[in-house]
Every structure is written in C-alpha cells, then in structure tokens.
Amino acid sequence: MQVHAKMKLTWVRRQFRHPRMLCLLICWMMITQAFSQSVPMKISALSDNHVLVSLTPEQRYLLLPIEEDEAQAALKVIVDNEVVETLNVKLAADHVDYSVPLDLGRYTNKPVLLDVTFHNERRSTGDVKDFTAWKAMQSAAHFDTTNREKYRPLYHHTPLWGWMNDPNGMFYKDGVWHLYFQYNPYGSQWENMTWGHSTSKDLVHWTFEGCPIRPDGLGTIFSGSAVVDKTNSAGMGKDAVVAFYTSAGTSQVQSLAHSSDNGMSFTKYDGNPILTDKVPDFRDPKVFWNADLNAWNLILAAGQQMNIYSSKDLKNWTFESAFGREYGNHDGVWECPDLMKLPVEGTKEAKWLLLCNINPGGPFGGSATQYFVGSFDGHKFVCESQPKVTKWMDYGKDHYATVTFDNAPDNRRVALAWMSNWQYGNQVPTQQFRSANSVPRDLGLFVDQGETYVSVTPSRELLALRGDKVSHPTAACEILIDLRSQAQPTTITLSNAHHEQVVMTYQPKDHTFSMDRTASGLTDFSNHFKAITIAPTHGKLTQLRLFVDKCSVEAFDASGRMAMTNLVFPKVPYDKLTVSKGARVTIYDLK
C-alpha cells in the first residue's frame, strides 16, 4: 500500500523536536481532514454478530475505526460477488482509539459489500448496528501518518502505523538495504500477517515502501528470507530477488515469490507450496548460497529442531539433516533461524554460527535469541559445545527474531532484531504503532576460555548520526563511558525529574553488567515488564556504548563482548546521567 508518496520515517519522527513546526503540523492535519468525509452506507444485521455493510467508496481509502479492547471481527471485502480481501479487525463499538486505512482505490465509485462477523467473545453487548464504527468510518484520499506517539523512536526503524514483529527477507542490492517485516496494517496488535517493506541507503533512515507480499488462499504470510539470485539458478532472471516465506493457513507450508524490480513487488510462484511437512510448527525459512557446496541451503524451524535442506534451483529441495533435539534451551518454540560462516577474531579460522530464536525460554522470561557455534559442510551442522550449554546473543528482555541481511557488502553480517518481547509486545503503551527494530549490529566470533562466542558490535553506519557533544543525555543520544581505570563496581544511572531511572552496574570482579528498569517509567501495563537483566562480560569492559532513544536503552561493550537491549517508557526523556567517580563520559546528541 502506498500512502501519500513514499513517506520518510525520519521526517514524521522528528516533528516535535522543532517547536516551530507545530503550526505547520496543525495546518497539515486540518488540510488532511478536508480530504476525508463520512461514508453513506446501508447496514443490515443478519444476526447479533453478523452485519452486511453496503457502500460506494468515492476516495481511495476507507478509514476503519479501531477499538483495541474489542474482540476481532472477520471482515470480507466483496466486489462483483467476489471476495477480494479478508482481514481480522477490532472495529470500534463504544469509542475510537485510532483508524487504519483499507485501500479500495481499485473499486472507487463501485458498490462494495463488507461482510462482518463479530466473534462471540466481543466485549460490547450493544446492538451491532449501533456500533461507533459505522458513524466514525470515513472515506479519504490520503491517510495521515503524522506521528502522534511520544514514544516513537527517533533513529530506530518503526512502521508508520500498525503492528510489526519479526524482521524478514532482508537483503542488500545496488546500494540499498531492504527490510521486510511481519506487519499488521489493520491494527497495532498482532494479526493479519503481511510482509511490510522499508528501504534505506544507510541502515538508519528508512522509507516505507508498502506491502508487497499479502495473504492469499494458502494463508497469511509468516516469516522468511530473500536472496539475490546472481546466476539465475531459479530461472526467474539474473539478479532476481527470490523470497521464501511460510504460508500459515490450516497448516504451515513454505512458499516462494520472485521480484524483477529489486524487491518492490513480487510474483508468487505457481508451484507453491515448495516445501511441506506434518510438523505443526514448521516455519521461517532462511535461504543462503553456500559457496563450499556450490548450492543453496535452507534452514527452518520444525518443532524443537532445525531442518536443513539443499537445492540447485531454489524450487526443489532435498532434506539433508536436522539439528537441535539435545542442544540448548527447549523451554519454548524454536523459530526464526539463521546460519552463517564467520571469521574468528585473532585467528585465520572461520566457524559457523546458527541463530535460534525461542519463545518462551529467554534468560529473563519470554522471547530471546540463543545461538550455537560449530561446523557445517552443507549437509550437517555439528555444534562444538556440550549439549546443555546455552548461549544468548543479547542479555536484555527486548531482542528477538534476530536475522541477517543477504548479499551485504564487504562480506559483512549485519543483523536486526525485533525490539520487544512476546510477554508484553501487544500491550506496550503506544497505539498508532507498536514495536521497533534494534539498531543494526555487525556479527563476528571470539574465543574466551576455550569457548567460541558471538561478538555483537553496533554497525558503523550509526557513527553518522553523531551530532554535537552535549553535557547531559537527550531523548536520542549515544553515551560513551571509559571503564579502563575502574577496578571497583561502577554504577551508571539515567534519570529524570519524575524520579524515573535506569540503573546499570558493572562488576569488574564478577565480570558482569546489569540493567535495572524496575523504576524506569511506565511499567504497569504488564506484570512481566519490570526486570533486572544481567550479562556476562567475558573479561574486563574497556568502553561502554549506550544508545538511548525515546523508548529504549541498548548497551554494548565496544569490543563486542556484551549486548543488552531493554525497552523503557519514561514520562519524559532522561536528562541526567550519574556515573561512579573515575569513569570518563562522552555524550553525543544523535541527529
């Protein structure tokens, strides 16, 4: 769906940083209202929970009023006696929390029938014909995406509106980073899984491109990956972008789509599904070119293990092996895998890193990313650690579904994660949108006491965000803390005038770093949100890098030995930093 032109996320995020823009924003909202109008409609109640709404849209968008506390309703859009779209939506019964756009541009000035079936568990007991939704529904030429959320990050990717979770299908091509993501364009809670799409030239400033892969007869569109087919092995064109995703219908099967316009639009393969299994949780295909095998590999989650396949043409896949039954954490569902070859720091050796996202089962509850290091010959992955060893990529509560970009320049492995947790992702205190991605991170490997671990370093593109050095924290800042002279425990506190604070502690003797967000701001939206998270530092920390944004604090050891990501929701941004004596501090405002 294209909204206005391609809207720049950075523009809408930064309006309220410039007070003089306020008048312009108000004028813009007034102009937008002038382009919307109420919709004449006929409402026919077939039962207490079944309504037919007849209307003739005169403009592109039908704005659906949403009430988040209501139950889902199944909505079918019918044109010329054909169902052209099916979605689940929480239509407003009593009040409107926000509206979402239903694109009816192809059917302007044609009769459209909305067949709406409300679930029996709906909260409202009133007559469905009297729902607020029918009175508040509007037709509009444009959908206003001006930011209305105080907690929208200033330099993290977010959807303009709606719900987002897993990053999907990420690749780099012709100077552009492509990020697809699990997306609900019809509400700010999980539902209607679709692939949203954003692009960037610098991994920081993102442009929303629409929804190129939408649900179909095989089901909604769950997570997956994309590759650049440089040799036309699939027969879909040299340098075609080939996407793989899980079709989630009555069962979970794997499907393929290809793009000849650099991922802006996709054509689904007539032979879908390309891979099936009887396992209920069979999803999230990650495909990559294996130069050692001279073939393609695919890894996906199949219950409590990862299945590995190979192919010469991206369409016909041969099962090779399975990994994981006796390894790592099995307290939740395994999903969203990735598998890559990485150099080991300080050696001429390379090893394979297998990412396995798990929910629940994280070290502090809910979802998290565990990983395994070993060898892979294109057929079988062999983990070098003992089966009961569990390693975590990030020791915060809010780092999940981590995957990497295909075809990244300079053989880099750049990762993004969903910056939230399934324990409370649907309840965080925003409505226009929910969820952001982590900052981009480059991955590597290092050895500590005979074990190989993943190194996680903020991507170099973030350096371009640095503005002026400032004396105190801002709503968007990077804080560097030199810890080389610290032999005693070091406490770092971010706080504001409301006595809200995030307290971090580095224990050099124990080699641990912790973050306490129990008094960080709004926490009562979930019993699972208050937390103290603790990470091993694998030796002495030399420099701590903190990335602070409107709703997050991400902590890194400058050498990549430690990463911790936590959401926070202060009433006002933290503007005070207190650090134990002896630690040198530099703060950059991020522009």
Please give the residue ranges for each predicted region.
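Bacterial N-terminal signal peptides
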Residues: 22-33
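Beta-rich accessory regions
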Residues: 39-81, 104-123, 143, 346-348, ...
